[in-house]
């Protein structure tokens, strides 16, 4: 007697359901894909008991004839493809012909459908995959599918479902992603007979406000790039909107909701140091590519895809995201306590909860614009305060305006500080100086923050993280270019390492040389410092090197960093000016100029904000002027 037997369809369907129907959200996803493929422009989702008791999807799509309705619940029956070659030109979301058979086999399943030409609709009712009732029914054009008592006949699967809150969240995320991917469709959702949302207008930004709170869309960066191979459109979130949940990253490839590790990693790397450790940015991106260049038949759940040339896609995708980020001003605005917070978006303990962004839809200013805003803030209107130049020792090297590709005019003016601004008499009309002869006004607050008057209000800079950003980019560039910029010490300094310090020293020795450290072995875990980078303060050579090694080890144990990136971060953190250090006026100006010459002036290498702005409009509102 043969030991191998063909499984009955009902058993095969239950096994298949283990892959296709993992939880109530899986049912919702499969049914929504069918509704969209049917051409619906109105879809309603209703659930009870987080989908365990009921899932109902109502659409106004094409509907089905009787023979199609009976076939659609059969395994491997589909209208989407007829041959294997159709997979190379697939335009529909569904194609496997497994979903309804799998769902009906583990639930009490009801299907009601009517086509536009039919006067009477059809009702089919299944229990455990077996048809138990067929009847006519009145109803609107389209299809309604009700799934009751999911996994009622598979107790082991039902037992492993999570709490109602967890299952509800999974369902809501699925529906939300489809509502964002298909703005041309009117969506309505109910949970336990309570309406959760109803979105009609085909506006993605408006829908983002519905799901994430008012003014959320104002913090989006819009991008649109395309070539003959790939089209990329959508929205990027500003760094202060970063989250720990990757659920708030939406990738739609040919309008299909997908998860793709390469795309997620490329976005994360493009944001780079703008992100705090273990945070992810909000993104909503539509990628359009020739269907023959992707494989959607990776898993029965159809959430994963493969690109035929993933490297080529990444080489196009990453620069687009990086360029969009670099072209926008990421300095947050201070907001009064009266202003609304995006509490639904931001983590409760986030350091960025005090920050929000200006309501400037469809437009953001560039780094160069902010620098010019800072330069033009030197001039008060209608009157200009008397200012005088101050010349003191420089901690930061000054650069000519030609050194700043994004920095605007690179003017050099003077300022005596806060007391001179308050006490100086106003200029007469005939002695008002040329605005280009006046330096922007800068004050140091508590030897920690730099306050600058800008044309549109006020800018506050954290002096430590600003200098850290400057030093970090210099260090990265010097190491990558392999042109050490070292200043020799008149009296070499001896350093005796502990065993663990010497081990790390050996690991980074070559890159220390690239950075500008001229170090000579002296035997028995001892070295002589004969030269250091020009940014190292005299007298601090030994301390800086030891602190760098300690910082490097700490970063290596907590973060997954490239060796040079780790070294640059360690160097900049330990060598930057500290909070509490008094700066001269020239040092403050030079620091700001150098900051705006960097590629990413809005965050330090560890992701903390460098610049905060307070606009005149916000000040006027705080003082009741508006």
Swiss-Prot record:
Cross-referenced Pfam families: DNA_mis_repair, HATPase_c_3, MutL_C
GO biological process: mismatch repair
Keyword vocabulary terms for this entry: DNA damage, DNA repair
Origin: domain of life: Bacteria
One example GO MF annotation: ATP hydrolysis activity
InterPro entries: DNA_mismatch_repair_CS, DNA_mismatch_repair_MutL, DNA_mismatch_S5_2-like, HATPase_C_sf, MutL/Mlh/PMS, MutL/Mlh/Pms-like, MutL_C, MutL_C_dimsub
Family per record: Belongs to the DNA mismatch repair MutL/HexB family.
Function as written in the Swiss-Prot or TrEMBL entry: This protein is involved in the repair of mismatches in DNA. It is required for dam-dependent methyl-directed DNA mismatch repair. May act as a 'molecular matchmaker', a protein that promotes the formation of a stable complex between two or more DNA-binding proteins in an ATP-dependent manner without itself being part of a final effector complex.
PANTHER family per the UniProt record, alphabetical: DNA MISMATCH REPAIR PROTEIN MLH, PMS, MUTL, DNA MISMATCH REPAIR PROTEIN MLH1
HAMAP family (alphabetical): DNA_mis_repair
Record-given protein name: DNA mismatch repair protein MutL
Phylogenetic classification of the source organism: Bacteria, Pseudomonadati, Chlorobiota, Chlorobiia, Chlorobiales
């Amino acid at each position: 007697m043969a030991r191998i037997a063909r499984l009955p369809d009902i058993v095969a369907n239950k096994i298949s359901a283990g892959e296709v129907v993992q939880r109530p959200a899986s049912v919702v996803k499969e049914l929504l894909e069918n509704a969209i493929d049917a051409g619906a422009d109105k879809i309603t989702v209703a659930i009870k008991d987080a989908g365990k008791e009921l899932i109902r999807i109502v659409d106004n799509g094409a509907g089905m004839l009787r023979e199609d309705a009976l076939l659609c619940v059969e395994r491997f029956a589909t209208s989407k493809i007829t041959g294997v070659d159709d997979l190379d030109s697939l335009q529909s979301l569904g194609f496997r012909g497994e979903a309804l058979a799998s769902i009906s086999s583990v639930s009490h399943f009801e299907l009601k459908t009517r086509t536009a030409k039919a006067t009477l609709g059809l009702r089919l009712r299944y229990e455990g995959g077996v048809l138990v009732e067929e009847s006519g029914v009145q109803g609107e054009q389209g299809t309604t599918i009700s799934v009751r008592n999911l996994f009622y006949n598979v107790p082991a699967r039902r037992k492993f479902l999570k709490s109602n809150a967890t299952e509800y969240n999974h369902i809501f995320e699925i529906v939300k992603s489809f509502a964002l991917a298909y703005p041309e469709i009117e969506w309505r959702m109910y949970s336990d007979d309570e309406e959760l949302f109803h979105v009609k207008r085909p506006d993605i930004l408006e829908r983002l406000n519905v799901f994430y709170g008012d003014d959320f869309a104002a913090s989006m960066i819009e991008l649109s790039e395309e070539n003959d191979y790939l089209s990329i459109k959508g929205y990027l979130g500003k760094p202060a909107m970063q989250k720990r949940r990757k659920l708030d990253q939406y990738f739609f490839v040919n309008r299909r909701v997908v998860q793709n590790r390469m795309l997620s990693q490329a976005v994360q790397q493009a944001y780079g140091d703008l992100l705090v450790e273990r945070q992810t940015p909000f993104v909503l991106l539509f990628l359009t590519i020739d269907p023959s260049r992707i494989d959607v038949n990776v898993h029965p759940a159809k959430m994963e895809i493969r690109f035929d040339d993933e490297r080529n896609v990444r080489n196009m995708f990453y620069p687009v995201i990086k360029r969009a980020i670099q072209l926008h001003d990421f300095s947050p605005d201070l907001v009064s306590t009266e202003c609304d917070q995006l509490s639904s978006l931001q983590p409760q303990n986030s350091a960025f909860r005090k920050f929000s962004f200006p309501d400037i839809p469809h437009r953001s200013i560039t780094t160069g614009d902010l620098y010019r805003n800072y330069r033009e803030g030197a001039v008060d209107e209608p009157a200009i305060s008397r200012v005088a130049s101050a010349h003191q020792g420089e901690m930061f090297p000054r650069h000519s305006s030609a050194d700043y590709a994004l920095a605007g005019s690179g003017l050099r003016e003077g300022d005596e500080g806060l007391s001179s601004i308050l006490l100086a008499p106003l200029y007469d009309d005939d002695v008002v100086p040329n605005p280009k002869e006046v330096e922007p006004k800068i004050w140091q607050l508590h030897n920690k923050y730099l306050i600058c008057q800008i044309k549109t209000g006020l800018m506050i800079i954290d002096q430590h993280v600003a200098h850290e950003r400057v030093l970090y980019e210099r260090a990265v560039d010097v190491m990558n270019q392999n042109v050490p910029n070292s200043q020799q010490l008149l009296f070499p300094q001896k350093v005796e390492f502990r065993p663990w310090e010497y081990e790390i020293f050996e690991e980074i020795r070559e890159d220390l040389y690239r950075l500008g450290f001229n170090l000579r072995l002296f035997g028995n875990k001892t070295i002589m410092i004969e030269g250091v980078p020009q940014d190292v303060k005299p007298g601090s050579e030994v301390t800086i090197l030891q602190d760098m090694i300690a910082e490097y080890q700490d970063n290596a144990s907590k973060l997954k960093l490239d060796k040079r990136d780790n070294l640059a971060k360690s160097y900049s953190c330990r060598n930057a000016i500290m909070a509490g250090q008094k700066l001269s006026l020239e040092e403050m100006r030079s620091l700001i100029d150098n900051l705006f010459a960097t590629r990413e002036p809005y965050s330090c290498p560890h992701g903390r904000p460098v610049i905060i702005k307070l606009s005149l409009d916000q000040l006027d509102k705080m003082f009741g002027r508006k």
